Amino acid sequence: MKSVNIFTDGSCLGNPGPGGIGVVLRYNQHQKKVSQGYFQTTNNRMELRAVIEGLSMLKEACNVTLYSDSQYMKNGITKWIFKWKKSNWKTANGKAVKNKDLWLLLDEKIQIHYIEWKWVKGHSGHYENEICDELAKLGANNPTLEDVGYQPA
């Protein structure tokens, strides 16, 4: 099984507002970068979409080390999602889970991979996180996509 590193970040100019994702995928000496922009979205949706896009780039089951500065994404996929599924997608206080569409998609994407989730402190000089941040901001400043599933509060 191939071992890959995926670095992700999301950005939003206003929250809600235009948003973007940045992804760096590394396999051996190969590297691929992705920047995408969305017209109207939130920061959390961009963090989730960045991870989904990174995993979507993989053509086969892989050992993945995934780096993100989003505690929301990391806690959601490694802890909270199990309770959400059991409670029919309700939070502990009985409210509907936000971004359910993306959580379902992310949950689907992780099933064939072995993933080690790594949190990195944002804006702390972590090289790949800074690249992803730049790619995400580039996308947010040049949106071309609709964030299908986004629902204004």
UniProtKB/Swiss-Prot annotation:
Annotated source species: Haemophilus ducreyi (strain 35000HP / ATCC 700724)
GO MF annotations, alphabetized: magnesium ion binding; nucleic acid binding; RNA-DNA hybrid ribonuclease activity
Cofactor: Mg(2+)
Reaction(s) this enzyme catalyzes, per UniProt: Endonucleolytic cleavage to 5'-phosphomonoester
GO biological process: DNA replication, removal of RNA primer
Subcellular location: Cytoplasm
Pfam families according to UniProt: RNase_H
Annotated Mg(2+) 1 binding sites: 9, 47, 69
Protein name: Ribonuclease HI
Record text on subunit structure and interactions: Monomer.
The record's free-text note on cofactor binding: Binds 1 Mg(2+) ion per subunit. May bind a second metal ion at a regulatory site, or after substrate binding.
Key words of the record: Cytoplasm, Endonuclease, Hydrolase, Magnesium, Metal-binding, Nuclease
Record EC number: 3.1.26.4
Function: Endonuclease that specifically degrades the RNA of RNA-DNA hybrids.
GO terms for cellular component: cytoplasm
UniProt-annotated binding residues for Mg(2+) 2: 9, 133
